[in-house]
Swiss-Prot record:
Primary location: other
Stated role: Catalyzes the terminal and only committed step in triacylglycerol (TAG) synthesis by using diacylglycerol (DAG) and fatty acyl-CoA as substrates. Required for storage lipid synthesis. Major DAG esterifying enzyme in stationary phase when TAG production is particularly active. Involved in lipid particle synthesis from the endoplasmic reticulum, promoting localized TAG production at discrete ER subdomains.
The gene coding this protein: dga1
Protein name (database record): Diacylglycerol O-acyltransferase 1
Subcellular location: Lipid droplet; Endoplasmic reticulum membrane
Lumenal compartment residues: 71-113, 163-216
GO cellular component: cortical endoplasmic reticulum; cytoplasm; endoplasmic reticulum; endoplasmic reticulum membrane; lipid droplet; perinuclear endoplasmic reticulum
Organism encoding this protein: Schizosaccharomyces pombe (strain 972 / ATCC 24843)
GO BP: any one term: triglyceride biosynthetic process
Length: 345
């Protein structure tokens, strides 16, 4: 854990990585870790499919398939994380690739439950994965006693093997049932929600930070329902690691993306970055730093039926705190930005 005495307001951070780490074998290990994460869904699904070609595996595959159909652990918020996996070296390599660093502005009471709000979404929220779904950025050292579950779409849990991999990293469904279950288990159990969602990913551009937040009230209602505190988190640099094909609302690409989002619940950003073996073009993210500043919690009383006014007031306070993080640290972490923070509905 590194003390950030030179940055006002930050009391501790993920240790910075050595510059030499990008000039030796670790440079390639970092790239390999990011590549394997990028293709993890395809690899796990393919591995499962290939096994069906071998008759001796059929009894095991059939049993697994039945279990896959009936198991609802990802919806009910069951804790199936494997600490050894979250602490595995590849996730540290993953975080060092960019690098991804967490910055703490206050201590969090491990006797409380928290809803971490992650902004911006970026293309695929790689900072959220590295910083919160693994120990690659030392989350547990910075926030001892806080057990955070990163939340994602239900559709990710319908892929054989991949869904078990996600749950082993403490990644669960973003459904209401899952959220309430996790936040009601025991003190310290918390969730991370990428609040802008699919719509915000379509706005991701290097140098820009466009958030879809003004009409997102679900996470505030969840805070009231469970009595959880809200913690705004701003990931400076999340939008800079991929470029996106022009998709302004007048283009056919945007219209196609909107249709997919309405049908499937997620969208398909057409993005590009660098290659695994080249720095010019590919689907690998660029090596640009992602600095995640974790703000101060907003305590929310437990209420089954809060008034609209109470919801609006907490929502406004959350936005105020988030904008405060942006204004305080934008010149520290994004000195070369091309635009200021923009919030939309």
């Amino acid at each position: 854990m590194s003390e950030e005495t030179s940055i006002p307001g930050i009391i501790a951070s993920t240790p910075p990585i050595s510059k030499d780490s990008r000039r030796n074998v670790s440079h390639w290990l970092q790239a390999l870790a990011v590549f394997l994460h990028s293709v993890s869904l395809t690899l796990t699904a393919s591995w499962y499919t290939v096994l069906w070609a071998f008759l001796p595996f059929w009894p095991f595959l059939i049993v697994y398939l039945i279990w896959l159909i009936y198991d609802d652990g990802f919806v009910t918020g069951k804790d199936r994380q494997k600490r050894w996996l979250r602490n595995a070296p590849p996730y540290r390599w993953f975080c060092h690739y960019f690098p991804i660093r967490l910055h703490k502005t206050t201590e969090l009471d491990s006797e409380k439950n928290y809803i971490f709000g992650y902004h911006p979404h970026g293309i695929i929220s790689l900072g959220a994965f590295g910083g919160f779904a693994s120990e690659g950025a030392d989350f547990s050292k910075l926030f001892p006693g806080i057990n955070v579950s990163v939340l994602t779409l239900n559709s990710n849990f319908y892929v054989p093997v991949y869904r078990d991999y996600l749950m082993a990293l403490n990644i669960n469904s973003v459904s209401k049932k899952s959220c309430v279950s996790i936040l009601s288990r025991k003190p310290g159990d918390s969730v991370l929600i990428v609040i802008g969602g699919a719509q915000e990913s379509l706005l991701s551009r290097p140098g820009q930070n466009n958030l879809v937040l003004k009409k997102r009230f679900g996470f505030v209602k969840l805070a009231f329902l469970t009595g959880s505190s809200l913690v705004p988190c701003f990931a400076f640099g999340e939008s800079d690691i991929f470029e996106q094909v022009d998709n302004n609302p007048r283009t056919r690409i945007y219209k196609f993306q909107e249709i997919v989002k309405k049908i499937a619940g997620f969208t398909v950003p057409f993005f590009y970055g660098r290659g695994l073996l080249n720095k010019t073009f590919g689907l690998m993210p660029w090596r640009k730093p992602i600095n995640i500043v974790v703000g101060e919690p907003i305590d929310v009383p437990k209420k089954s039926h809060p008034t609209n006014q109470e919801i609006y007031e907490v929502h406004e306070e959350y936005i105020r705190r988030l904008e405060g993080l942006w204004n305080k640290y934008k010149d520290v972490f994004l000195p070369n930005r091309i635009s200021e923070l923009k919030l939309s509905a």
